[in-house]
A protein has these predicted regions:
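Outer-membrane beta-barrel translocator domains and adjoining extracellular loop/strand segments
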Residues: 39-53, 91-102, 152-172, 204-215
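Outer-membrane beta-barrel strand-turn architecture
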Residues: 71-77, 128, 139-144, 184-188, ...
Length: 238
């Protein structure tokens, strides 16, 4: 629903911009090859383990394709609004952890997992897809350079197999992006772009599907995520 509302709002903005005068409008459409580097600081709290927490830092690098459409107007200093979409961003690396939480076993100093016996393999897996961006662009004079800022959303599909039988729900990731780039001409109607952006994602949080028998709490995972993206694009203008 959030994505639908965002798309409707963007389309409405496009229509409002279009009434400024057909002769001043320029429409663009194209495809992009993107490279992204992301950093995450995650914390997982296990149920029925005296609040046992696991902290982990991770760095991710991935590449993906996207498509975009834009409209801009000379009557508002060349200000443009656009929408880009990438159906698949990254398949997260699958990780298997051996868990042996025997009754009364001391997990960390002074932390005993009394009453817990979740022994087995914990499989961590997932993917990020449906990356949607709604953004504004503003040219820097006639230099070909431009500034960019916008809103982003993606879906983190979780596919974890926890020893406790609990599962995490999928997470809607939202955030903002800022950056800039350079646009060059390829003939009369084609163009190319080189662009760099920084994405600031809102903090992520998800709870497990099953409550613990001892405390009634649930597994919980929290994460802070940031990313940078470089893009090369080609497109047509009308």
């Amino acid at each position: 629903m959030k994505k639908i509302n965002t798309i409707l709002a963007a389309v409405g903005a496009l229509l409002m911009l279009s009434v400024t005068g057909a002769n001043s409008l320029e429409f663009k459409a194209g495809v992009s090859a993107n490279g992204m580097a992301a950093y995450a600081n995650a914390k997982e709290t296990l149920k029925d383990a005296n609040g046992r927490t696991t902290n982990e830092e991770a760095i991710l690098a991935t590449s993906f394709a996207s498509a975009f459409v834009e409209v801009s107007s000379d009557e508002v200093m060349g200000l443009g609004i656009g929408i880009s979409y990438a159906p698949e961003v990254v398949d997260l690396e699958k990780e298997t952890r051996g868990i042996q939480n025997h009754l009364g076993e001391t997990l960390t100093a002074g932390n005993t997992a009394s009453g817990v016996n979740d022994t087995g393999n914990q499989i961590i897996d997932g993917k990020i897809q449906d990356l949607l961006s709604v953004y504004l662009t503003l040219p820097v004079g006639d230099t070909g350079a431009y500034l960019k800022a916008g809103w982003i959303q993606a879906t983190l599909i979780t596919a974890e197999n926890l020893t406790t039988g609990s599962k995490y729900e999928d997470i809607d990731m939202t955030g903002t992006q800022v950056g800039g780039g350079y646009e060059g001409v390829l003939g009369d109607m084609a163009f190319w772009r080189a662009e760099g952006t920084y994405q600031r994602w809102e903090d992520l949080s998800a709870s497990g599907s099953e409550a613990g028998a001892t405390t009634g709490g649930k597994n919980k995972i929290e994460a802070e995520v940031g990313s940078v993206t470089g893009s090369l694009s080609i497109g047509m203008k009308f």
